[in-house]
Amino acid sequence: MATYTTSDFKPGLKFMQDGEPCVIIENEFVKPGKGQAFTRTRIRKLISGKVLDVNFKSGTSVEAADVMDLNLTYSYKDEAFWYFMHPETFEQYSADAKAVGDAEKWLLDQADCIVTLWNGAPITITPPNFVELEVVETDPGLKGDTAGTGGKPATLSTGAVVKVPLFVQIGEVIKVDTRSGEYVSRVK
């Protein structure tokens, strides 16, 4: 099995920690004035979803995680599972609610997603960075009502709620950044 040293650490690197695959969210090399250098990392356990701060001594080795990231197309959802299909082999993968997590509110039919597999089963779903969704419910923006922050909540066709500018109306299609859940622009 492959191993990584602390000099190989970068955001997105996947490795094994306590028998569970983890991904590095951010890392920083620290060389204190006194003592041994170390790498301060923030990691997310891919199965449990926990975010931890872990320090590794300089030169420490970790085992590479045997995970695969596949580009799959979201097909449909039934009572318990979301189904994804490989666009070339037409092989289907089913993911449970734990694997889908917050990505559920950004999944559209036929959307290309990144599905992370461990031991052949999906453990995380990453939706596209940007999605275009229709506004199904929002308050009407009143002319001249700009004294506040200039935003209002809007419910989208998938059930997600995002803050949008006052000029956005019901029925309009907007572009949303799925990583932050923020409004980007209107779609013409």
Swiss-Prot record:
<keyword id="KW-0648">Protein biosynthesis</keyword>
<dbReference type="InterPro" id="IPR015365">
    <property type="entry name" value="Elong-fact-P_C"/>
</dbReference>
<feature type="modified residue" description="N6-(3,6-diaminohexanoyl)-5-hydroxylysine">
    <location>
        <position position="34"/>
    </location>
</feature>
<dbReference type="InterPro" id="IPR013852">
    <property type="entry name" value="Transl_elong_P/YeiP_CS"/>
</dbReference>
<dbReference type="InterPro" id="IPR020599">
    <property type="entry name" value="Transl_elong_fac_P/YeiP"/>
</dbReference>
<dbReference type="GO" id="GO:0005737">
    <property type="term" value="C:cytoplasm"/>
</dbReference>
<dbReference type="InterPro" id="IPR012340">
    <property type="entry name" value="NA-bd_OB-fold"/>
</dbReference>
<keyword id="KW-0251">Elongation factor</keyword>
<dbReference type="GO" id="GO:0043043">
    <property type="term" value="P:peptide biosynthetic process"/>
</dbReference>
<dbReference type="InterPro" id="IPR001059">
    <property type="entry name" value="Transl_elong_P/YeiP_cen"/>
</dbReference>
<protein>
    <recommendedName>
        <fullName>Elongation factor P</fullName>
    </recommendedName>
</protein>
<dbReference type="Pfam" id="PF01132">
    <property type="entry name" value="EFP"/>
</dbReference>
<dbReference type="InterPro" id="IPR008991">
    <property type="entry name" value="Translation_prot_SH3-like_sf"/>
</dbReference>
<dbReference type="Pfam" id="PF09285">
    <property type="entry name" value="Elong-fact-P_C"/>
</dbReference>
<dbReference type="InterPro" id="IPR014722">
    <property type="entry name" value="Rib_uL2_dom2"/>
</dbReference>
<keyword id="KW-0963">Cytoplasm</keyword>
<dbReference type="InterPro" id="IPR011768">
    <property type="entry name" value="Transl_elongation_fac_P"/>
</dbReference>
<comment type="pathway">
    <text>Protein biosynthesis; polypeptide chain elongation.</text>
</comment>
<dbReference type="InterPro" id="IPR013185">
    <property type="entry name" value="Transl_elong_KOW-like"/>
</dbReference>
<keyword id="KW-0379">Hydroxylation</keyword>
<dbReference type="GO" id="GO:0003746">
    <property type="term" value="F:translation elongation factor activity"/>
</dbReference>
<comment type="similarity">
    <text>Belongs to the elongation factor P family.</text>
</comment>
<comment type="function">
    <text>Involved in peptide bond synthesis. Alleviates ribosome stalling that occurs when 3 or more consecutive Pro residues or the sequence PPG is present in a protein, possibly by augmenting the peptidyl transferase activity of the ribosome. Modification of Lys-34 is required for alleviation.</text>
</comment>
<dbReference type="Pfam" id="PF08207">
    <property type="entry name" value="EFP_N"/>
</dbReference>
